[in-house]
């Protein structure tokens, strides 16, 4: 596995390619179009795009023709006109009886009917919205609203490998939820709620291996990456093991873990933690995984250059395993990190100090 990963990392393209990313902001009405040259390692701001609102989370549709975003009380969609320009198409106020909650996360179905799933966070419970799209992929209407019950606080969503299950990571409710997805309408129906293995684990984000046999879950409060096995017949989740996202002996109360993503080749997993104090760094880690998705080993646990603020959100590249993007909201920047075989290092930093940057990033190409 290590030799395969090293080969992937050290193989370089023949010619330089400019890759494009979009970056969201927590507190300012801006989206940022960024370019990364994979040979010169230059990271540049291509466009500072004024938007309808600040956007806490951004995600692309299956064709990369639309960008979907969250705001305090709404969902929005932007048409991608060029790799560095966006056109606002639609904003929908979130629906549901979730007082004090804010729109926090979106996930899009990659097959017909291409519905978009959103969840709110905060207040006394979370609400979920199922959103239809129009012929151009823009958000159209909220076709279903549901809630997760008192005490819930869902912060992350993932769609199963067969596109028939919606998994929800319930940070406040210390559990994972499972809903079936109707293949005709895209609407969901409750199936199960699975408690975390220990009190105060607080599942924050979740991602599913393409073969559908494993789920990777960030435990925000205990600062661990948890591995769940999935029964491919029943889709039942079973906790199996976990790995630390802060050094052993460090107090969990000083950290809050954040994001998890599979690499492009699915040969390893990236995960991050944030520090609650500006004078402590967050951490970035990678894990070698088997062909079936089981976690084999933790490759490294490396401090990030800042606490990460509310971000330290990792975004894997869509063109290879060598690079990932990392955003920071303490100082307001995006970085590109390179995997070197047994460790990782920063190769480019772009300051976007715009009184609100940066939330998460997505690679357009």
Where are the regions a protein language model picked out?
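Short loop/turn segments immediately following the C-termini of beta-strands
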Residues: 26, 70-72, 119-123, 171-172, ...
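Fungal secretory targeting signals
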Residues: 1-18
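Blade-level signature of beta-propeller repeat domains, shared across WD40, Kelch, NHL, RCC1
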Residues: 329-335, 340, 345-365
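Short loop/turn segments immediately following beta-strands, especially the blade-tip
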Residues: 33-41, 77-86, 130-139, 179-187, ...
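Beta-rich, blade/repeat-based domains predominating
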Residues: 51-63, 95-112, 147-164, 196-214, ...
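Beta-propeller fold detector
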Residues: 43-50, 87-95, 138-147, 188-195, ...
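An edge-strand/N-cap motif at the start of beta-rich repeat modules
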Residues: 16-42
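Hydrophobic beta-strand positions that form the internal "hydrophobic ladder"
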Residues: 21, 67, 116, 166, ...
């Amino acid at each position: 596995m290590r030799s395969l990963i090293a080969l992937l990392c050290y193989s370089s393209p023949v010619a330089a390619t400019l890759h494009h990313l979009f970056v969201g902001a927590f507190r300012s009405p801006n989206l940022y179009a960024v370019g990364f040259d994979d040979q010169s390692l230059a990271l540049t701001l291509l466009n500072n795009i004024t938007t309808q609102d600040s956007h806490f989370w951004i995600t692309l549709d299956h064709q990369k023709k639309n960008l979907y975003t969250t705001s305090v009380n709404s969902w929005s969609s932007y048409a991608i006109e060029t790799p560095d320009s966006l056109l606002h198409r639609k904003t929908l106020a979130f629906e549901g009886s979730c007082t004090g909650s804010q729109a926090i996360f979106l996930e899009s179905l990659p097959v017909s009917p291409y519905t978009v799933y959103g969840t709110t966070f905060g207040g006394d419970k979370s609400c979920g919205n199922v959103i239809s799209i129009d012929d151009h992929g823009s958000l159209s209407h909220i076709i279903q609203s549901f809630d997760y019950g008192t005490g819930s606080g869902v912060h992350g969503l993932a769609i199963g490998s067969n596109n028939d299950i919606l998994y929800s990571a319930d940070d406040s409710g210390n559990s994972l939820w499972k809903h079936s997805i109707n293949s005709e309408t895209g609407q969901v129906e409750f199936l199960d709620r699975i408690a975390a293995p220990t009190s105060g684990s607080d599942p924050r984000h979740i991602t599913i291996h393409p073969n559908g046999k494993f789920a990777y879950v960030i435990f925000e409060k205990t600062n661990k990456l948890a591995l769940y096995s999935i029964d491919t017949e029943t889709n039942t989740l079973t906790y199996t093991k976990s790995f630390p996202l802060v050094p052993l002996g460090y107090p969990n109360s000083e950290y809050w873990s954040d994001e998890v993503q599979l690499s492009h080749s699915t040969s390893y997993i990236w995960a991050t933690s944030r520090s609650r104090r500006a004078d402590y760094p967050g951490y970035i880690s990678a894990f070698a995984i088997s062909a079936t998705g089981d976690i084999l080993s933790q490759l490294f646990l490396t401090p990030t250059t800042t606490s990460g603020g509310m971000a330290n959100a990792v975004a894997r590249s869509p063109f290879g395993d060598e690079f990932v993007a990392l955003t920071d909201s303490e100082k307001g920047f995006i970085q590109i990190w390179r995997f070197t075989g047994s460790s990782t290092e920063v190769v480019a930093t772009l300051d976007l100090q715009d009184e609100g940057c940066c939330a998460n990033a997505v690679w357009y190409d």
